[in-house]
Amino acid sequence: MKRYFVTGTDTDCGKTFVTNQLVNYFSSSAAIKPIASGCEYSKNQLVNSDALLHQQQNHLPLEIINPWRFRLPVSPHLSAREDGASIDVHKVADYCLNLQLNDIKKLFIEGAGGLMVPLNEQDTWLDFLKLTRIPVILVVGMKLGCINHTLLTQEVLEINKIKCQGWIANCLDQDMLMLDENISTLEAKLKYPLLARTNYGGKISDICLSSL
């Protein structure tokens, strides 16, 4: 089973939407979101809305999709602390590397926030990737400032020798000035391919998804 880690340029760049689009596009694929904050109680358990969206597609138990759940809608390390818990990045890494799902050929692992979001007082998603070496798919929320955020993310990945399989342009605002020019600028400056583009909540447009 191939595994990909879906990260983004920042919070609310559209990781969950794009991840679901990837699952729709590829047969025999599934998605999980191992860590989520901002969960609410429903039927005596904490539930995350992003994890529920994945469940609607995967039909997997929430315990498999989202084993680490916390209440407050803040950074995972703070939300876990408020719940009297802590996140062990080694356990998260082991879970994502060893999870086996019948008939699934591609597993998309959605992170929480961006690459440098703290999971505890010492570790970030970058440390998770150093442990697992799972290749990254970078979701770029196309908005003012995204070029800077994207190039900074690329630099961190390169310095730490983390493989990036490619990036996806998630077009958030149909009124964004010079959208196509921004995408072209990123294509010229990034060292990995543009895999696909999504337009304002529409279906994913394949550009180079066959490389996955």
From Swiss-Prot:
ATP binds at D12, C13, G14, K15, T16, F17, D50, E110, G111, A112, G113, N170, C171. This is ATP-dependent dethiobiotin synthetase BioD. The active site is at K33. Pathway: Cofactor biosynthesis; biotin biosynthesis; biotin from 7,8-diaminononanoate: step 1/2. It catalyses: (7R,8S)-7,8-diammoniononanoate + CO2 + ATP = (4R,5S)-dethiobiotin + ADP + phosphate + 3 H(+). Homodimer. Pfam families: AAA_26. Catalyzes a mechanistically unusual reaction, the ATP-dependent insertion of CO2 between the N7 and N8 nitrogen atoms of 7,8-diaminopelargonic acid (DAPA, also called 7,8-diammoniononanoate) to form a ureido ring. Belongs to the dethiobiotin synthetase family. HAMAP family: BioD. It is found in: Cytoplasm. It comes from Legionella pneumophila (strain Corby). CDD domains: DTBS. One of its GO terms (biological process) is biotin biosynthetic process. Keywords: ATP-binding, Biotin biosynthesis, Cytoplasm, Ligase, Magnesium, Metal-binding, Nucleotide-binding. Substrate binds at S37.
